């Protein structure tokens, strides 16, 4: 039976799909966060005993402060400034909302995963998620990558929670990843493939029993992964795989170099990095336009080798690309915002990895998926993910880590109590032997 918390989380996540124009597009859920969390949730937090939440709050506050400083120095327009700052504010409020309702009710992670899936089914993909390469691939590839793949991944995660005792589920998840790669959804497939393999290694601890075994396991995984990658490239070059973004293979001088293919597939991130280096200290401001055409030329050079065009062809409505949450922070607001964002991402990645071995079996695949997906999203997904999908990963990782830490502390207390009881029993027996002659 659905309780109030479950219904609230379902409706809240679905509310991100209902948008209207208010100094840019804003959803019902974001407007709800701006009112509900500061008035209802934040006053209820027991900050004196919430050291982790204080660290996260401080990191977000520092990021927001550097963003405000950057926007002031750059002299950015008010609408763009408000849009950039709103993403950070909503990200923090989204995280706090989920942590508040998931605390003590880890089972609501299932409702959260289902809500993510339902949102994709009802509202589809956000156009901001699509890079220029994605649009150029056509409707079929975009439909697979931004609609079908996320739905299948969320459905699989939900099933892994329900049927967690089925020990071969991680391998099935890896097979799903291989299928998605072949069909053209390389990033979604790669995340699923890596998630399944890592989860399988964790569940079969013989692979992680010592450092030598762990190193050997990673070498084997890298070798197998590259062998599959080389086979995929050879089939694309032979014309046997033509789906999705396979055209990018032909743009590479050496397609068997995965880094070169990554540059072709995520050229906006590399261009964004160059834009970051051009204005290293305080960035270009939120959502800056490429008025000189410099970054448009770089994009064309990386996509099809055509690196020159006339000034009349420059689009003054072309935003400087980044397609990376982390790089985008530096490109927009400079190195201090970049480091602040990097700290936030690294903090949750570290907590997630620390929870791998102690996580409840029911949520092990989910945890590994969100950790790997968080890393990929931070590196190669647009800035809008910081307000919507990344707080979900933050909250899931935080709750699972807190639960594992609590279980460890409870186990330590039980062990201490048992040792004390055993010590008292031995002490009593010794005392009885020593005083036996007195009683007799």
Briefly describe each language-model feature range.
Residues 1-251, 318-434:
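Hydrophobic transmembrane helix bundles of membrane-integrated enzymes that assemble
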Residues 80-86, 207-213, 254-280:
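Cytoplasmic juxtamembrane interface segments
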Residues 253-254, 314:
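Intrinsically disordered, low-complexity segments enriched in polar/charged residues with Gly/Pro
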Residues 259-263, 267-278, 282-333:
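Long extracytoplasmic/lumenal interhelical loops at the membrane interface
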Residues 435-440:
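Short, charged juxtamembrane terminal tails flanking transmembrane helices
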């Amino acid at each position: 039976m659905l309780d109030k918390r479950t219904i609230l989380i379902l409706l809240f996540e679905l509310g991100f799909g209902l948008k209207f124009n208010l100094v840019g597009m804003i959803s019902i859920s974001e407007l709800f966060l701006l009112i509900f969390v500061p008035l209802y949730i934040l006053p209820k937090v027991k900050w004196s005993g919430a050291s982790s939440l204080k660290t996260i709050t401080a990191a977000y506050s520092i990021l927001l402060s550097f963003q405000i400083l950057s926007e002031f120095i750059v002299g950015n327009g008010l609408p763009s400034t408000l849009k950039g700052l709103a993403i950070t504010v909503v990200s923090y409020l989204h995280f706090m909302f989920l942590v508040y309702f998931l605390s003590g009710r880890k089972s609501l992670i299932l409702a959260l995963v289902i809500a993510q899936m339902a949102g994709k089914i009802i509202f589809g993909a956000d156009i901001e998620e699509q890079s220029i390469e994605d649009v150029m691939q056509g409707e079929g590839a975009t439909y697979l990558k931004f609609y079908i793949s996320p739905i299948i991944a969320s459905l699989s995660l939900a099933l892994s929670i329900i049927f967690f005792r089925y020990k071969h589920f991680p391998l099935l998840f890896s097979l799903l990843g291989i299928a998605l790669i072949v069909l053209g959804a390389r990033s979604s497939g790669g995340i699923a493939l890596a998630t399944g393999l890592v989860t399988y290694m964790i569940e079969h601890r013989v692979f992680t029993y010592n450092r030598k075994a762990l190193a050997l396991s990673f070498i084997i995984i890298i070798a197998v992964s590259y062998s599959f990658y080389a086979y995929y490239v050879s089939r694309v070059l032979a014309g046997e795989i033509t789906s999705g973004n396979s055209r990018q293979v032909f743009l590479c001088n050496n397609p068997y170099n995965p880094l070169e293919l990554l540059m072709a597939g995520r050229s906006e991130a590399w261009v964004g990095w160059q834009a970051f280096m051009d204005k290293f200290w305080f960035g270009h401001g939120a959502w800056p336009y490429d008025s000189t055409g410099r970054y448009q030329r770089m994009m064309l050079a990386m996509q099809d080798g055509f690196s020159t065009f006339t000034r009349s062809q420059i689009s003054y409505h072309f935003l400087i690309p980044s397609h990376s949450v982390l790089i985008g922070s530096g490109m927009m607001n400079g190195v201090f915002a970049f480091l602040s964002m990097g700290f936030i991402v690294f903090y949750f990645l570290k907590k997630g990895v620390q929870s791998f071995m102690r996580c409840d079996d029911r949520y092990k695949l989910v945890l590994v998926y969100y950790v790997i997906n968080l890393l990929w999203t931070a590196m190669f997904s647009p800035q809008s993910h910081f307000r919507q999908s990344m707080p979900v990963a933050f909250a899931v990782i935080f709750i699972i880590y807190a639960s594992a830490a609590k279980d460890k502390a409870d186990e330590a207390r039980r062990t201490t109590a048992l040792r004390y009881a055993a010590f008292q029993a031995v002490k009593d027996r010794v005392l009885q032997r020593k005083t036996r002659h007195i009683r007799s």
